[in-house]
Amino acid sequence: MEHIYQYSWIIPFVTLPVPMLIGAGLLLFPAATKKLRRMWAFPSVFLLSIVMIFSIDLSIQQINSSFIYQYIWSWTINNDFSLEFGHLIDPLTSILSVLITTVGILVLFYSDNYMSHDQGYLRFFAYMSFFTTSMLGLVTSSNLIQIYIFWELVGVCSYLLIGFWFTRPIASNACQKAFVTNRVGDFGLLLGILGLYWITGSFEFRDLFKIFNNLIYNNQVNFLFVTLCAVLLFSGAIAKSAQFPLHVWLPDAMEGPTPISALIHAATMVAAGIFLVARLFPLFVIIPFIMNLIALIGIITVFLGATLALAQKDIKRSLAYSTMSQLGYMMLALGMGSYRAALFHLITHAYSKALLFLGSGSIIHSMEAILGYSPDKSQNMVLMGGLTKHIPITKTAFLLGTLSLCGIPPFACFWSKDEILNDSWLYSPIFAIIACFTAGLTAFYMFRVYLLTFDGHFNAHFQSYSGKKNSSFYSISLWGKEGSKMLNKNLRLLALLTMNNKERASFFWKNTYQIDGNVRNMTWPFITIQNFNTKRIFSYPHESDNTMLFPMLILVLFTLFIGAIGIPFNQFNQEGMLLDIDILSKLLTPSLNLLHQNPENSVDWYEFVTNATFSASIAFFGIFIASFLYKPVYSSLQNLNFFNSFAKKGPKRILWDKIINVIYNWSSNRGYIDAFYAISFIGGIRKLAELIHFFDKQIIDGTPNGVGVTSFFVGEGIKNVGSGRISFYLLFYLFYALIFLLIYYSVYKFII
C-alpha cells in the first residue's frame, strides 16, 4: 500500500501533457493538428481515466485503513526559511479526486460531440485538461502555498473557459467580471495565508494546526488578529464558491460552453471554496465567530440564490442560481459543524447538477437546430415547451436530476439535504425555518424549469399557433404555459390569460405580443447541421447523439445510487452483528474523530422516517405549487368555476399581484445587487479615476508646465529691456535696490 501513496504525487500531472502537446502541435504542425483534431479527445479521456482508477484505489485504501499520507520535499533557502512542497492523501483528497475525475471524464466524452462543430475544439480540450490538472493539484496540496498556486491556476482556467467565445462581447465581459470578482476574494486569501504564517511560522497543514491549537490553548496570540486572518481566508472561499456578496459572477459565467458549466460551475471549481473551508476546518472550528459567520453567509446565500432563480428565463442561469443556493447549503453545514453532511451534499449535488447541465446542453443543442446559434434564443425557456416527444431520453434524465435536486427520495440529494435540514434545527430554529422554506422554493423553481421546458406545446414555431382567424395575438408565457384555445370574452378567466401590450409583465401571466401578418405566414428556414460529413435537416428539436446521451445515462446512475454511500443508519445481519453500511462516515473517520465530540452517526428508523417525511413533504409541496401554476392552461379549463372564484378576489387579488410583481422584479433584476455594485463600486472607482486623472494633468503636470511657461514669458519681457543703454540698466538697478531696502526695513521693524 505504501508504494501507492508514494507515487500519488503524479495525480495532478497525468493530464498535463494534453495541453502541452496540443499547443506544440498547433505551433509546429498547425494544418495536420487541425485536420486530426478529433483524435485529441481520446488522450484527454484516457489520461483522466488513469487518474480516476488511481483515485478510486486510493479511496478504497482510505476506507479500509483510514490512513493519512503526506510526502514533503523541502527546499531550504537559508537557515531560517525553507519552502516545502508535497502531496497530502486523506479522505477529503480522495473524495474530491474521485469526484473531479468521474465528472471530468463524462464531460470530456460529452464535449467531443457537443463541441465538434466549433472552430475552438482543440483549444477547448487544452483548457479542460489544464483545468483538471489545476484542480487535482489543488486537492492534493499539502500546504497553503501550493493551494494558492493551484487556486490561481483554476481561476485562470475559469477565465479562459468562460470567455471561450471571446468574440462575443457579452462572453468577454462575463469572463472579466468573474476574474475581477474572484481577485477580490483571492487577495483576501493571500493576506490570510501571510497572516497565518506570521502567527504560526508554517504553511504545512499538519504543523499549522498543531501550532495554532497550542497558541490558542495557551492564550499566546492576539485572538482578534487570528479572527481577522480567518475571515480573510474565508473570503477566498466566498468568491470561489459564489457566496454572498461575491456571487455576482456565477450567472454571467454561463456564457461559456455548456460542458464547462457542468464541470467547473457545478461539480468542481465552485466546490473549491467548500474544499478550502473543509481543509481549514480544524482551524475554523476553534474560532466561534468565524463558524457563525460561515453559517450566516451560507444561509443568506441559500435563500438569495433560490429567490433569484424564480424569474429566470435562461435555463442555464436558472441552474446557476440553483448551484449558488446549494453551495450555500454546504457552507451552512460547515458553519454548523456538520462536516460530514457538507461533504455528502457536495458529492450528491455534483453528480445531480452535472446531469442537469448536460441535460440543458442537450436541450440547447436540439433548439439550435431550429433557432440557429443564438444563446438568447436557444437557452430561452420562453421558446421551449413540449419537448417531451422530441427528446424523450433527455427529458427523462433531466426529470431524474430535477427530482434529485428537489430532495425527493430515494434520489441522491434527498439523503444529504435531509441531513443538513435536520442538523439546522439543532443549530438555530431561525436558520432551520429559512433552510426548510428554501428547500420548498428549490422544488418550486426546479419544477418550473422542467415544466416550461418539456410541458405544453413547442413555442418556437409561431405559425404553428395561428389560432382562429379572429385571433391576432399569440401569448408567450414567461412563468407558465398558456393555451391557444379561444375563450369566450365573457369569461372572467380571460383577464388572467391575456394582457394588453402596454401592460408590464406580471409574475405568472406575461405580456402578449402582436405578430405581424407577414411573420405569421412566412416559412421558417430549416437549419442544416453538418457532422462527420453527413447532413441532417430538422424542423423540430431532435434527440442528441449517443455520445452525448451516454454520459447523461451514467450520471443518472450516480444520481440514483450515490446517496447510498451516506445512508445514516446501520443494519444487523443474520447473526445479529452490527453492519456499518455508512461508507462515507467510515471514510471520514479520521476527520470525524478530530472534529466531532460524538462520532456516532447512526439514527433509529423512527427518527429517520419522521425527518425524511417532513423534508420530502416540503419538496412535494413545492412541486405541487409549480405544477398548479405552470401546467398548460388548456388542461385546466374543465373547472372554470374554481378559476373564476380565484379571480373574483378583488382587493386581495390586487394585493397579491403587487406582492408577486415585487418578487418578480427582485428576481429578474438579480436582487438589485449587480446594479448596486455598478453604481457604488464601478461608478465610484470611475469617479475616483477621473479625479486622479484631473489631479495628475492639472496639478502634477500643471505645476512644472506652469513654471516653464512663466519663465518663458518673464524671459521674453526681460529680453526687451536689455537694449544696450546704460541708463536703463542704472534705472533697474536702483529699482531693485529700493525693493530690497523696503523688504529689509519691513523685516527689521517686524523683528524689533
From Swiss-Prot:
Subcellular location(s) per record: Plastid, Chloroplast thylakoid membrane
Class of this enzyme: translocase
Membrane topology, as annotated: Multi-pass membrane protein
UniProt keyword list: Chloroplast, Membrane, NAD, NADP, Plastid, Plastoquinone, Quinone, Thylakoid, Translocase, Transmembrane, Transmembrane helix, Transport
Catalytic reaction equation(s): a plastoquinone + NADH + (n+1) H(+)(in) = a plastoquinol + NAD(+) + n H(+)(out); a plastoquinone + NADPH + (n+1) H(+)(in) = a plastoquinol + NADP(+) + n H(+)(out)
Main subcellular localisation: plastid
Pfam families linked: Proton_antipo_C (PF01010), Proton_antipo_M (PF00361), Proton_antipo_N (PF00662)
Biological process terms in GO annotation: ATP synthesis coupled electron transport
Enzyme Commission no: 7.1.1.-
Gene Ontology cellular component list: chloroplast thylakoid membrane
Keyword Cell cycle: no
Family: Belongs to the complex I subunit 5 family.
NCBIfam families: NDH_I_L, PRK06590.1
Function noted in UniProt: NDH shuttles electrons from NAD(P)H:plastoquinone, via FMN and iron-sulfur (Fe-S) centers, to quinones in the photosynthetic chain and possibly in a chloroplast respiratory chain. The immediate electron acceptor for the enzyme in this species is believed to be plastoquinone. Couples the redox reaction to proton translocation, and thus conserves the redox energy in a proton gradient.
Oligomeric form and interacting partners: NDH is composed of at least 16 different subunits, 5 of which are encoded in the nucleus.
Protein name in UniProt: NAD(P)H-quinone oxidoreductase subunit 5, chloroplastic
Organism whose genome encodes this protein: Manihot esculenta
Lineage start: Eukaryota, Viridiplantae, Streptophyta, Embryophyta, Tracheophyta
The gene coding this protein: ndhF
